Amino acid sequence: MTMNNPYFEVINEEIKAVVENKGDVLETRDSAMDAEVQSEQVEGFIDEKVDCILINAVDWKAIGSSLKKAKKAGIPVIAVDTLVYDQSLVDGIVVSDNYEAGAQCAKDLMKRKKKGKILFLVQSENKSAIDRIKGFKETLEKAGWNYENIGDIECKGQLEVSQPLVENVLTKTKDIDVVVALNDPSAMGAMAALDAEHMLSDVLVYGADGSPEAKTMIYKNRMMATAAQSPRITGKKTVEMLYKILAGKPVESQYIVPVRLITRDNVEDYSLSGWQ
C-alpha cells in the first residue's frame, strides 16, 4: 500500500533478498495509498510483460479490473498481506489471520474492563483492516460485552492522518475509554493526540502489526496491546510461493500467517528493536 509503513518495507526486503540472490529483479512500486495509481502501476507491469505480480491492494474491490487484465495476459498474481474481492483473479494469497488479530485484542479488553466507550480507526477499502475491526467487534458482541461506539474514523492506516482526526474527535468529546486502531501507525497517531490532551494514561489503545515503535510504547505502559504480525514470515512465504508458481509447481491457494498478541504482560518476551 505504502512504503511509509515500515511493515511493508520489511516484507519488501525479505522478498528482494531472495529474488536478487537468484539473479532476478524485483521492481517495487509505491502507490502511496492511491487505488487509481496502483491500478496504473499494475497495468504498467502488464505492459512490461513481467513474470509475476505481487499485490497489496489499496482497494480490495477496485483493483479487480487491473487484475483481470493480468490474468488475460497470463501473468500470475499473488495477493500479499490483504485479500482481493475476486480471489479467482489471483494465483496465491499470503495473509495474516486478521480476524483473529481483532479477536485477540477484544479478548484482552474484556479481561481489563466490563464496559467502555470505544473509538475505532478504520480503513474500509482494505480487507485486512476490515477483518481486524470485524473480529474485534464481533468478539465483543458474541460475549455480550457492553460498549458504545464513539465512531468509525477513516484514517487510511496512517499516523499523519489519524492524529489530526483524533484531535478533532477530542474537541467534541473526551469521554473515551478505548481506541482500537486498524494498525500500529494509526494507533501511534491516536496516542499522540491523546497525549497532547494528557489522556493517554486513561485510555486503552490497541493496534495491529507488532512494530518496534508499538512494542516500545507498550513497554513504557503507554499502549495496551498490538496484535503482532510477522512481515518476515509474510515475505518469506510470498517469495517461496512465487518461485513455486514460476516453476509450475502446485501451491496452496492461501497461506495464513499466525498472529500473536503483545501486551504489557508479555512485551518483555519480544525484541523492542526489531520485527517478528
Predicted region positions:
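Extracytoplasmic "Venus flytrap"
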Residues: 1-18, 22, 27-44, 48-50, ...
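Short, solvent-exposed amphipathic alpha-helices that sit
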Residues: 7-24, 101-105, 128-146, 161, ...
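Short beta-strand elements in bilobed, periplasmic/extracellular small-molecule ligand-binding domains
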Residues: 19-31, 117-122, 140-159
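Structural recognition of the beta-strand scaffold that forms the well-ordered cores
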Residues: 27-29, 54-56, 76-81, 95, ...
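Hydrophobic alpha-helical segments within soluble ligand-binding/sensing domains
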Residues: 38, 94-118, 130-131, 159-163, ...
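Hydrophobic alpha-helical
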Residues: 46, 55-70, 136, 151, ...
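Flexible loop/hinge segments that line or gate small-molecule binding clefts
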Residues: 56, 60-100, 111, 117, ...
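Hinge/cleft segment of the Venus flytrap/periplasmic-binding protein
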Residues: 138-143, 230-276
